[in-house]
């Protein structure tokens, strides 16, 4: 990076890749560039450190700890009780994330993450409730564009059963009173972690213990979620991000005209697609609302369900009414069947 800085003018440095967040921040500090600080980048990557900072700011989040031995892990389990979540310190999405219900399951998950040989992992309280996310483009620590989406069902539940047709739904009701607490808490998280001008992606839970923050990333969300926001709000979010980073302002105004969503229909098993049931019926009914889709050809190899929401067959829909959008996605999941051989 020093050679690059000497060879040519570098004005900004950004990344959408979670694993490069700290590297990019270190490079910015080395080159004297504006952007997310190395301290904030580390807090966004190190989940236990992030949650400790949030707890110190009295922001509700799961009890958690960094552990690097089976003894420390079991001590946390005895103190906190089950179920627990065990995952990498700086993981990506739900990759290598385990929900464990007993000491035996905890030991197996610890083996998978290398805790038994001294590798660090994050262990935390399992938070019961509905799961969603709050995304922003923020400037000087204040969200200038904000969006709210929901998972149906939770990410870990969707991974537990391939018969589930998992959905992501981006609401056009962001300004409603029912979301006020989430918006205020999201803004407090951004300020607490020192996130200045950046895209952010914050996951949350709402359940018997109220609203709790899961984690936040200083980057756009994955799964091409921004495409949902662009369609639903009649704006170019990618251009707005560039304007925020380069000019320190955002002129785009979200219309909130449409709710948008993505539903994935998984094959009945691994193998090769042999055909579809009710595909014609589905395509006919959703024609007015579908704006993107992927229907793998007969004979194509299936993709592991762990690969995310845009694997195998999927559909992206838009509708003026959020509830109607969700019902359409539910109907697709109930109706379409993907057969394999």
Please tell me what each predicted stretch does.
Residues 64, 86, 123, 145-148, ...:
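Generic preference for hydrophobic
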Residues 43-122, 127-128, 139-141, 170-184, ...:
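Active-site nucleotide/adenylate-binding loops and adjacent lid/helix of ATP-dependent enzymes
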Residues 56, 242-341:
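Peripheral (often C-terminal) accessory segments that flank ATP-dependent C-N-forming ligase machineries
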Residues 81, 206-212, 306-311:
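A short, glycine/Asx- and small/polar-enriched loop/turn
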Residues 104, 125-195, 199, 206, ...:
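ATP-dependent carboxylate/phosphate-activation module, predominantly the ATP-grasp catalytic core
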Residues 1-68, 75, 263, 305-311, ...:
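Conserved N-proximal alpha/beta basic substrate-recognition cap immediately N-terminal to
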Residues 11, 119, 191:
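Short acidic/polar active-site loop segments enriched in Thr and Asp
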Residues 34, 90-93, 222:
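A short, flexible beta-alpha/helix-coil linker loop
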């Amino acid at each position: 990076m020093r050679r690059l800085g000497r060879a040519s003018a570098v004005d900004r440095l950004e990344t959408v890749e979670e694993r490069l967040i700290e590297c990019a921040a270190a490079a910015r500090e080395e080159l004297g560039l504006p952007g997310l600080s190395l301290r904030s980048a580390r807090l966004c990557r190190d989940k236990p450190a992030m949650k400790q900072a949030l707890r110190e700011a009295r922001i509700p989040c799961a009890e958690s700890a960094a552990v690097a031995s089976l003894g420390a892990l079991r001590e946390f389990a005895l103190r906190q009780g089950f179920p627990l979540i065990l995952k990498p310190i700086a993981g990506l999405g739900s990759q290598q994330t385990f929900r464990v219900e007993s000491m035996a399951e905890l030991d197996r998950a610890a083996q998978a993450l290398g805790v038994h040989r001294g590798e660090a992992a994050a262990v935390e309280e399992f938070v019961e409730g509905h799961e969603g996310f709050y995304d922003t483009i923020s400037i000087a620590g204040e969200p200038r564009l904000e969006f709210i989406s929901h998972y149906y069902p939770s990410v870990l539940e969707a991974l537990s059963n391939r018969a589930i047709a998992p959905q992501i739904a981006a609401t056009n009701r962001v300004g409603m009173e029912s979301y006020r607490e989430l918006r205020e808490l999201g803004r407090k998280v951004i300020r607490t972690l020192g996130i200045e001008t950046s895209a952010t992606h914050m996951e949350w839970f709402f359940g018997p213990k109220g609203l709790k923050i899961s984690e936040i990333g200083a980057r756009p969300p994955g799964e091409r979620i921004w495409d949902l926001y662009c369609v639903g709000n009649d704006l170019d979010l990618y251009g707005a991000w560039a304007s925020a980073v380069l000019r320190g302002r955002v002129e785009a105004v979200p219309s909130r005209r449409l709710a948008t969503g993505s539903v994935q229909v998984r094959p009945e098993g691994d193998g090769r697609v042999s055909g579809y049931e009710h595909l014609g019926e589905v395509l006919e009914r959703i024609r007015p609302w579908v704006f993107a889709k992927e229907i793998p050809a007969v004979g194509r190899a299936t993709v592991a369900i762990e690969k995310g929401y845009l694997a195998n067959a999927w559909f992206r829909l838009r509708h003026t009414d959020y509830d109607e959008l969700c019902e359409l996605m539910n109907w697709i999941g109930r109706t379409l069947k993907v057969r394999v051989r």
